[in-house]
């Protein structure tokens, strides 16, 4: 009964099904007698027992049958070897036994390598990682592709195996290789929504600008598949090519990747990467991961970092090269700074009409910039809290600031209305003054139109901030 449930397990890795559901691996009851097998069973019967022992993972029987003369590289129906089958089910113990007996780790069938089979196996990452490590230790090539031009790292990235991806790169796997559709490992990770894989690949030097054959970048693939957090991360990342592990030697990289603590070994759990905070994501995105510990030691937050002056950068040990990267990132993220030019705090009575009109035009223009900035924020702000990439403080803080903004805009609207009424009063008095020479109608109409537009713009800005306030309150 249990044996029958296992029928059909060996399926070719990488999503490429074999021509048979069981690939020649028949499952049945194993008659384990105490007699020695060597020389007592016909070769065909030994092969059948060998296949059945492989299927149920009976390591001791496999060893016994190998001792009886079965070839470790014998091929069964459809060309599968014992090692390929063991890799397909992520049986690390069987893989080790077969490799120790001389199995060929570089064997391939129809462009399907054993390493690809292991990377696309169905099993725990712990077992898959052990199998991959064993195969790589026997010189399996991590850059040999299947018929679809997919390499082992692409399969590992697609299936979400972060440790396997890092191990393959440590053994020379090319990060930016593209398959027949132009997908890289990063594209596959973005498509499947594996955030930790995306972060690890960027750290290892993956190029987020490489496009698929239909012209899509990894960020666009993530967005198309509704992985908005990854889309934000890839759009935010400015300089992914400075992978911090790229300059290490192979041995140092392997040591760095595979260092485990006693608890991890005890529980057989490989590291799950902790969620990045806003500071870590920002530094990672611009290639300054090495500054993380320094800034944390000095209790420097992302907000503090982005508002530092040049002397503060130097005081905190931030080099000029790193300063340039931070300032470049800040320039990209920053809303255009509002400049009111040389407007004085008090307008002199001798101010000309042209100068006063210029003041109103500047004020109106800056209000327009503010409206556009708020509209952009509303458009880009995620409607779901789960889609926020960076860590946020309490929403109450944002709501309180929005309330202050609404109050300020209301005050501004009130003052502009007073200004409009005052100007209208002056205009009426001048029109009723018999000594006043009437100006051309076009000028008066133009001035009135400007004032109306200014008032409408300010009122519209106030309404927009009121809507923004309601939006934050709902969240």
Curated annotation (Swiss-Prot):
Q: Where are the ANK repeats?
A: 45-74, 78-107, 110-144, 148-177, 181-210, 214-243
- Keywords, in A-Z order: ANK repeat, Cytoplasm, Developmental protein, Differentiation, Meiosis, Phosphoprotein, Repeat, RNA-mediated gene silencing, Spermatogenesis
List the SMART domains. ANK
Note down the stretches annotated as region Disordered: 1-25
GO terms classed as biological process: cell differentiation; male meiotic nuclear division; regulatory ncRNA-mediated gene silencing; spermatogenesis; transposable element silencing
Q: Which residues does UniProt call coiled coil?
A: none
Quote the subunit structure annotation: Interacts with DDX4, PIWIL1, RANBP9 and TDRD1.
User: Entry's PANTHER family?
Assistant: ANKYRIN REPEAT, SAM AND BASIC LEUCINE ZIPPER DOMAIN-CONTAINING PROTEIN 1
The protein here is known as Ankyrin repeat, SAM and basic leucine zipper domain-containing protein 1
Q: Which gene encodes it?
A: ASZ1
């Amino acid at each position: 009964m249990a044996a029958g449930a296992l029928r059909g397990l060996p399926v070719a890795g990488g999503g490429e099904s074999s021509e048979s559901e069981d690939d020649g691996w028949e499952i049945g009851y194993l008659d384990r007698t105490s007699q020695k097998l060597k020389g007592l069973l016909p070769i065909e019967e030994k092969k059948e027992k060998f296949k059945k022992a492989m299927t149920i993972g009976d390591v001791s029987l496999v060893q016994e049958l190998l001792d009886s003369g079965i070839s470790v590289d014998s091929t069964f129906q459809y060309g599968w070897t014992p090692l390929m089958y063991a890799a397909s089910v992520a049986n690390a113990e069987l893989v080790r036994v077969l490799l120790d007996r001389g199995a060929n780790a570089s064997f391939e069938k129809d462009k399907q390598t054993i390493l690809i089979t292991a990377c696309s196996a169905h099993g725990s990452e712990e077992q898959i990682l052990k199998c991959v490590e064993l195969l790589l230790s026997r010189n399996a090539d991590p850059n040999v592709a299947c018929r679809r031009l997919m390499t082992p790292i692409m399969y590992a990235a697609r299936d979400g195996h972060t440790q396997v991806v890092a191990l393959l790169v440590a053994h020379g796997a090319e990060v930016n290789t593209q398959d027949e559709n132009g997908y890289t490992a990063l594209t596959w990770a973005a498509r499947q929504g594996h955030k930790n894989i995306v972060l690890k690949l960027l750290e290892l030097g993956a190029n987020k600008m490489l496009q698929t054959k239909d012209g899509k970048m990894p960020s666009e693939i993530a967005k198309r598949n509704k992985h908005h957090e990854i889309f934000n991360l890839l759009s935010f990342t400015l300089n992914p090519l400075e992978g911090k592990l790229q300059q290490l030697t192979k041995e140092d990289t392997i040591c760095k990747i595979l260092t485990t603590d006693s608890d991890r070994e005890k529980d057989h759990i490989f590291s799950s990467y902790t969620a990045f905070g806003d500071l870590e994501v920002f530094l990672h995105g611009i290639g300054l991961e090495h500054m993380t510990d320094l800034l944390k030691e000095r209790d420097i937050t992302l907000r503090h970092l982005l508002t530092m002056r040049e002397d503060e950068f130097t005081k905190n040990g931030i080099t000029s090269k790193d300063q340039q990267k931070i300032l470049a990132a800040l320039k990209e993220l920053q809303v255009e700074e509002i400049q009111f030019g040389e407007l004085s705090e008090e307008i002199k009575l001798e101010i000309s009409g042209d100068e006063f009109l210029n003041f109103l035009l500047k004020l109106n223009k800056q209000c327009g910039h503010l409206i556009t900035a708020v509209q952009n924020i509303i458009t880009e702000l995620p409607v779901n809290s789960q889609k926020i990439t960076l860590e946020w403080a309490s929403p109450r803080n944002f709501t309180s600031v929005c309330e202050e903004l609404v109050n300020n805009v209301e005050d501004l609207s009130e003052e502009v209305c007073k200004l409009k009424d005052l100007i209208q009063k002056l205009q009426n008095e001048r029109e009723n003054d018999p000594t006043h020479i009437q100006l051309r109608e076009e000028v008066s109409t133009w001035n009135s139109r400007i004032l109306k537009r200014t008032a409408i713009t300010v009122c519209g800005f106030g309404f927009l901030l009121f809507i923004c306030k309601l939006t934050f309150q709902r969240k």
